[in-house]
UniProtKB/Swiss-Prot annotation:
PROSITE patterns: HISTONE_H3_2. Keywords: Chromosome, DNA-binding, Nucleosome core, Nucleus. It is found in: Nucleus; Chromosome. This is Histone H3. Core component of nucleosome. Nucleosomes wrap and compact DNA into chromatin, limiting DNA accessibility to the cellular machineries which require DNA as a template. Histones thereby play a central role in transcription regulation, DNA repair, DNA replication and chromosomal stability. DNA accessibility is regulated via a complex set of post-translational modifications of histones, also called histone code, and nucleosome remodeling.
Length: 135
């Protein structure tokens, strides 16, 4: 059998150009989206705005279900089968959050006094010692 040259059909120039053009436009759109980057905030600016928002708000910072589970777990140590009113759990949560916020404020002051902006465990220990809570 003699060899014959097989005829391979190639796409016409028009359709190839159309496909290429569509791909080019899509790539151009993707690049234009990436090239318009938002301006980055200065380091610490986002944290400061977060702090301001949280200081203005009055809602609780700790989630209710995990806090309630923690209270029940701690109460289980002293006496089993204790029941809590929801108002009692809410009062405990308010008091706990007020204590923690105050402690973190004092801890931050200790860090600032040491010419740092990052709080460390030694700052918290010092704050508790100054308060007279150290055991």
């Amino acid at each position: 059998m003699a060899r014959t040259k097989g005829h391979i059909e190639r796409p016409s120039n028009k359709s190839a150009k159309a496909v290429k053009n569509v791909a080019f436009k899509a790539a151009k759109k993707m690049l234009s989206k990436d090239s318009t980057k938002k301006k980055r905030a200065h380091p610490g600016a986002v944290a400061l705005t977060e702090i301001k928002v949280l200081q203005r708000s009055t809602e609780l910072l700790l989630r209710k279900a995990p806090f309630q589970a923690l209270v029940r777990e701690i109460a289980q140590v002293s006496k089993s089968d204790l029941r809590f009113q929801s108002a009692a759990i809410s009062a405990l949560q308010e008091a706990a959050e007020a204590y923690l916020v105050g402690l973190f404020e004092d801890t931050n002051l200790c860090a600032i006094h040491a010419k740092r902006i990052t709080i460390m465990p030694k700052d918290m220990q010092l704050a508790r010692r100054i308060r007279g809570e150290r055991t």
